[in-house]
Amino acid sequence: VTNKLMGERVFRKIMGTGYPDSANVKAGSKAIKYHLDYMHWLLDQRRWLAGNELSLADFAAAAHLSCLDYVSDVDWNRSVIVKDWYAKIKSRPAFRSILADQISGFPQPSHYSDLDF
């Protein structure tokens, strides 16, 4: 998901390798919906993605979502449960440096670094 969306929309522009491949963008957009739905299902069953304790799985998934959120590719209205989970991860001190990152030529959306978005 991240490679299809970020690779096409961001990396191609940075590397100067042409315009985004619309088939890859479409596939990535479809895949993120599936993953958000699956995360919703997991978080409906437990507190965190891999169980009832915060784990590396949460940080890994949140890091990918952070990249996609930076370019506004996450529909946070799709799942309040996933949005609340992500807000909890964003509020962790260990995650703050990720939220401070910026990509030249790609302004972050106003909600990106807002912990209570």
Region locations from a protein language model:
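GST-like fold's C-terminal all-alpha helical module
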Residues: 1-91
